[in-house]
A protein has these predicted regions:
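Conserved DHp (HisKA) dimerization/phosphotransfer helix of two-component histidine kinases, i.e.
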Residues: 5-33, 38-41, 45-57
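Conserved micro-motifs of the catalytic ATP-binding
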Residues: 33-36, 73-76, 148
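Conserved catalytic submotifs in the C-terminal HATPase_c
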Residues: 62-72
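ATP-lid-like helix-loop hinge signature
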Residues: 93-118
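Short conserved segment of the HATPase_c
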Residues: 132-144
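Short alpha-helical Gxxx[C/S/T] motif in the catalytic ATP-binding
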Residues: 156, 160
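Detector for a conserved hydrophobic position within an alpha-helical segment of the HATPase_c
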Residues: 164-165
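Conserved glycine-rich
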Residues: 169-170
């Protein structure tokens, strides 16, 4: 019994060490986030690469990409935008996995839609995971150290938001009846004009 207690305590300590490592790494990332190096990149290609990579994490989750164009060129820092897509899709996967832990039987899916016109690029990500608490507002969700995950540091979304802001964009969260919806709007030129969507 003493040995099993020792093993359990060791496991807890190891998990705590990992959490501290994650926190230190993410905090240094947040503090040292370089200015974006802007080049013309294809957002569809960056999205496709991240979807392929993250589809391997949990093959029981369907990830659909809905696109109106085969190519959307955006003047951006490829590494930073890839990190945004990676973090948001990974969050959706983890949210669905948390729902599965509650023994809920459902069709696990993530839908990503990307639209563009002369003024904006809009990305809409919808998942049917545990979702956001209706009581949490956008400032809470994006504040450093806010997290709903057992092992989370709460810095991931702050980093994502900073990258999006640095690319002249905005991040919005919408609680859904069954999951969550996230929207990213990148402004391409001039002032925000949401009426310009078709």
């Amino acid at each position: 019994e003493d040995q099993s207690n020792f093993k359990e305590n060791l496991k807890i300590i190891n998990n705590q060490i990992k959490q501290i490592e994650n926190l230190v790494n993410e905090f240094s990332d947040f503090a040292r986030m370089p200015k974006p190096i802007l080049k013309n990149n294809d957002l569809i290609k960056i999205l496709d690469e991240n979807i392929k990579l993250l589809s391997e994490v949990d093959k029981s989750i369907t990830i659909d990409l809905i696109k109106t164009n085969n190519q959307i060129i955006f003047n951006c820092d490829k590494e930073q935008i890839a990190r945004v897509f990676f973090n948001l899709i990974k969050n959706s996967i983890e949210s669905i996995q948390q729902k599965v832990e509650k023994n809920v039987s459902f069709k696990k899916k993530i839908s990503i839609e990307i639209l563009s016109n002369d003024h904006h690029i809009k990305l809409i990500l919808v998942d049917n995971g545990i979702g956001f608490n209706q009581n949490n507002n956008i400032k809470e969700i994006l504040s450093p150290y806010f997290t709903t995950k057992k092992q989370g540091t709460g810095l991931g979304l702050s980093i994502v938001n900073k990258i999006i802001n640095d690319h002249n964009g905005e991040l919005e969260f919408y609680p859904e009846n069954d999951g969550a919806k996230i929207e990213i709007n990148f402004k391409l030129n001039g002032n925000w004009n949401f009426n310009s969507w078709w």
